């Protein structure tokens, strides 16, 4: 639509402003006016282009002008269509495929002598196999089915049995034996056989042969029925999926241990309670973790919201953290949809509740904190719990968790979906691969009375697995029959009290210098009390720098000049955060590392690559000794352990230890010579001890640590069990020489605080008697009051 304005001089083209005003007054809508403007612009553009081609011929001409045809090249040849020639069909010989099966056999002709020789050697009858091609199948199932049917149809109904004793072969053998050899006749004559030729006897012989073949076939079938367990040297042979096997290979765990080979198939294939008794370092953690993960991985649509399937209870926070670390690594590498969780004392309960609220599938916990969550955390759903694992059962009983564990098991049983007659209807279909009943696993290194009672109250119709045979294991009801790993080398040394400190330093330096791989040397030193740990940590790490800003980890520049060494300390008085960080740093450190600790690190912890264990203070029982030395020589690796003893009655302690293990004696002279450089080791050791004494005298904090370490060591020494009081009697100690081992130059009676020390007195039975010291101090204070009053009143005291 064109809008033109007519004037006196004739029509003229309107300007843009005039056109806009005209359109606005026309009464058209905004959309209509916009369409008119667009149409006008389009017509103007077409006019500038010289018009619009309206016919097909014009368009074709313009296309040819824009795209001229390509001129043929001189080397281009026109395409010539050849007539079809029918070729005669040529039948090619069939090539045997891998899936083809023989359908018929043609026996090879042989003479009587050849057949006799073959039967005597036990060979099979040679045959020529004929193969037929298989048709094209849609899938592998049809191919296998067709091959099976074809092979069954092609089996000959009547065939000769190639076994000595049949009708044809037996007669042939008899004829050849009678005709030739030592039993043959003269000049080709026959010697009559003494065996019967009756038909009944011959049939009976054939029946016996058939029975032998049936028994052999049954034995072969019995071996193949458990083919999954035939290769028990690998995790896949035990029933673990390939995802778990790959994750274990990534963790440098390629072969299972003996206890794992006995435990994993039982927990995967059966639904019975299990008691696992094995020595320390045998791999009990993976023995119950892998079956739980394998069964959960077999379920479909499992996520953190599906529910809690397994609860693992441990006695200590460190062991709980260790098991959780193993679980978290396996789940991250093999099954990231399975979520583990951890609840322990010392952590924020609010954070634990948040993790439980999000959902966990496997929960590792200490009994006390878990019982607290049972009472106060409503989001903790226990309806789908299928496994309850009690690790370190003997330690759980020692710490008094029996009542708490009973409460936990009752709560789980009460809230479980597996209760009632119609419980199977309440189980989701995707959880059918899980056990249909709750499975309880009790793991322990020893069989003490408390563990036996715990097993009776928690296990029902349980199997029992041990490293030893069942007959030997049934007799293991005491710690005397409990042995340390065979690859562990144990030594003991008698050291005078005043040489204990320098001998410890010599042993540490010798272990690091003589180790085949100095960078991987890790030593654990066990002491009797936390104050002693703090003192020796300060001695070894003085002038050292902190590691990762931790107060429990420092470098030890004075220990060795040419080797960078790190020193850590660990005891129960530290906070949970400090203990966890210390263990993690000690485990990951690639330089030579020394961990000074109490018995808090002697149970359950699987610290990697511990090469040496030093028992600087004797253990409080033989069981504690076995758990201490069990920190090394784990999972088949080599390890060494050294026990320090004082001269005299303590030497009899070795006879008790030798009842269950082998120990050899060494001398402190050899240890000092190896640690302080051969010749002149006595002067070097003396100079080092004097240097420590000067440092203690010059530092008030170090002096206080030394005093506290000495007094705490005496108190701890008096806590040995009554059966060992004859060997560890406090009254037999030389307190002056023992104070020397703590770099103290004061007499034992002056080791109290400031001017009024508390003297250490011992009863006849070896226990500490503090009442006498308190009485003397009270008398001294009264005497002081009396003297002060007498001087004030001129020598007289008022009544």
Curated annotation (Swiss-Prot):
This is ATP-dependent RNA helicase DBP7. It catalyses: ATP + H2O = ADP + phosphate + H(+). Pfam families: CTE_SPB4, DEAD, Helicase_C. One of its GO terms (molecular function) is ATP binding. GO terms for biological process: ribosome biogenesis; rRNA processing. ATP-binding RNA helicase involved in the biogenesis of 60S ribosomal subunits and is required for the normal formation of 25S and 5.8S rRNAs. The Q motif is unique to and characteristic of the DEAD box family of RNA helicases and controls ATP binding and hydrolysis. Gene3D superfamilies: P-loop containing nucleotide triphosphate hydrolases (3.40.50.300). Keywords: ATP-binding, Helicase, Hydrolase, Nucleotide-binding, Nucleus, Ribosome biogenesis, RNA-binding, rRNA processing. One of its GO terms (cellular component) is nucleolus. Belongs to the DEAD box helicase family. DDX31/DBP7 subfamily. Its main location: nucleus. Residues 35-49, 56-66, 73-100, 114-132, 139-172, 754-780 have a biased composition (Basic and acidic residues). The gene is DBP7. Residues 208-220 have a biased composition (Acidic residues). Residues 511-679 form the Helicase C-terminal domain. ATP binds at residues 278-285, 306-313.
